[in-house]
UniProtKB/Swiss-Prot annotation:
Residues 31-131 form a propeptide. The gene is CAMP. GO terms for biological process: antimicrobial humoral immune response mediated by antimicrobial peptide; defense response to Gram-negative bacterium; defense response to Gram-positive bacterium; innate immune response; neutrophil activation. Transmembrane segments: none annotated. It holds the Pfam family CAP18_C. InterPro entries: Cathelicidin-like, Cathelicidin_CS, Cathlecidin_C, Cystatin_sf. This is Cathelicidin antimicrobial peptide. The cathelin-like domain (CLD), which is the propeptide part, does not seem to exhibit auto-inhibitory function, as it does not inhibit the antibacterial activity of antibacterial peptide LL-37. Belongs to the cathelicidin family. Residues 1-30 form the signal peptide. PROSITE patterns: CATHELICIDINS_1 (PS00946), CATHELICIDINS_2 (PS00947). It comes from Trachypithecus cristatus (Silvered leaf-monkey). Disulfide bonds join 86-97, 108-125. Coiled coil: none annotated.
C-alpha cells in the first residue's frame, strides 16, 4: 500500500517537471529579437547618444544577411536613417515622427546581438554620400561617351581630308 500512496505523487511531480521542461525553451525563445527589432533598438541607442538636434528614423533596412542561429553572436547590419522633425528631447517614438524635408541622411553599418537580455550593438553612422557617388559615375560615363564620340569625329575629319588630297596614280 505504501507504494501506491507515493505513486500518484511521483506522477504529479513528473508531470510538473515535464511541463516546466516545455515552458522553459519558450521563455528562452521569447528573448530573441528579430533582425528588424534589433536594428530599431540600436537606432534608439543611436538617437539617445546623438548630439544632433532631431531624432533619426529608419529609412531603409538592407536585406538580412544569412546568419547562424546563435542569438549571442554579433550579426552584421546595414541600414539608412533620415532626420525627422521631432527634437531629440521629445517622448515620441521616431516611427511616429515625419521625415524632415531635406533632412540629413546617414548610412549606418555595424553589428547587433539578437539576444534581448544582452541588448548589445556596435553601429557607426556617417553622412550618406551614395548620391554623390552615383553623380560621379554619371559624369565618368558621360566623359567616356563624349570621348568616344570625339574620337569618331576626329577619324571622320581625317578621312575627309585624306580623300580631298588628289591621289597620284602610279
Amino acid at each position: 500500500m505504501k507504494t501506491q500512496r507515493h505513486g500518484p505523487s511521483l506522477g504529479r511531480w513528473s508531470l510538473v517537471l515535464l511541463l516546466l521542461g516545455l515552458v522553459m525553451p519558450l521563455a528562452i525563445v521569447a528573448q530573441v529579437l528579430s533582425y528588424q527589432e534589433a536594428v530599431l533598438r540600436a537606432l534608439d541607442g543611436i538617437n539617445q547618444r546623438s548630439s544632433d538636434a532631431n531624432l533619426y528614423r529608419l529609412l531603409d533596412l538592407d536585406p538580412r544577411p544569412t546568419m547562424d542561429g546563435d542569438p549571442d553572436t554579433p550579426k552584421p547590419v546595414s541600414f539608412t536613417v533620415k532626420e525627422t522633425v521631432c527634437p531629440r528631447t521629445t517622448q515620441k517614438s521616431p516611427q511616429d515622427c515625419d521625415f524632415k524635408e531635406d533632412g540629413l541622411v546617414k548610412r549606418c553599418v555595424g553589428t547587433v546581438i539578437l539576444n534581448q537580455a544582452r541588448d548589445s550593438f556596435d553601429i557607426s553612422c556617417d553622412k550618406d554620400n551614395r548620391r554623390f557617388a552615383r553623380l560621379g559615375n554619371f559624369f565618368r560615363k558621360a566623359k567616356e561617351k563624349i570621348g568616344r564620340g570625339l574620337k569618331k569625329i576626329g577619324q571622320k575629319i581625317k578621312d575627309f581630308w585624306g580623300n580631298l588630297v588628289p591621289r597620284t596614280e602610279s
